[in-house]
Design a protein with these regions (language model features):
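Active-site mouth loops of central-metabolism enzymes
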Residues: 3-29, 53, 96-100, 128-134
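Gly-rich Lys/Arg/Thr-decorated short loops/hinges at beta-loop-alpha junctions or inter-strand turns
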Residues: 9-16, 36-45, 120-128
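A general structural detector for well-ordered alpha-helical segments in enzyme core domains, enriched
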Residues: 30, 56-64, 81, 104-108, ...
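Conserved, mostly hydrophobic/aromatic
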Residues: 34, 85
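Glycine-rich, proline-tolerant flexible connector loops at the mouths of alpha/beta enzymes
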Residues: 35-70
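Glycine-enriched alpha-helix->loop->beta-strand junction motifs that scaffold or abut catalytic
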Residues: 38, 87-93, 113-119
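Catalytic beta/alpha-barrel core
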Residues: 43-48, 70-78, 93-103, 123
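Conserved anion-binding
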Residues: 101-140
């Protein structure tokens, strides 16, 4: 079993404020605390507007990597943000939140193949979360 620290997520209000204000100390403390608690990976999710996300995700990656030496899990549905962030990660990242939505697959799977990244896949597509196990299995 691998433990993924999930506290660096821009959908959390305080983290969103830290991203917007470029509060590196706050983000770095979250990273260090999770690493010290035994996380094998750190999830980084800018959780911001799509137009800001590439820049914000890059800032998060740089900020976190400057204080911990564990692999990162890049968590974004935005292929543009992932494309930029994957260029600066120091260790092969994991890609989080791949789903069966064609636009995500088309934008993200080439990155996964090129960089040989492990993935976390969500069993859902354009129709949302499947209602039956059979439909779920067709997605994965």
């Amino acid at each position: 079993m691998k433990i993924i620290g999930e506290k660096i997520n821009g959908t959390r209000q305080r983290v969103a404020q830290a991203i917007a204000g470029r509060d590196a100390d706050y983000i770095q403390k979250l990273a260090q605390d999770q690493a010290e608690a035994g996380a094998d990976w750190l999830d980084v999710n800018a959780g911001t507007k799509q137009s800001n996300e590439p820049e914000d995700l890059i800032w998060l990656v740089e900020t976190v990597q400057s204080v911990v030496d564990i692999p990162l899990c890049l968590d974004s549905p935005n292929p543009a943000a992932l494309t930029e962030a994957i260029q600066i990660v120091e260790r092969t990242p994991m890609i989080n939140s791949i789903s069966g939505e064609p636009w995500r697959l088309d934008g993200i799977l080439p990155l996964v193949a090129k960089h040989r990244c492990p993935v976390i896949a969500l069993a859902m597509d354009d129709g949302g979360i499947p209602e039956t196990m059979r439909t779920t299995l067709t997605l994965i």
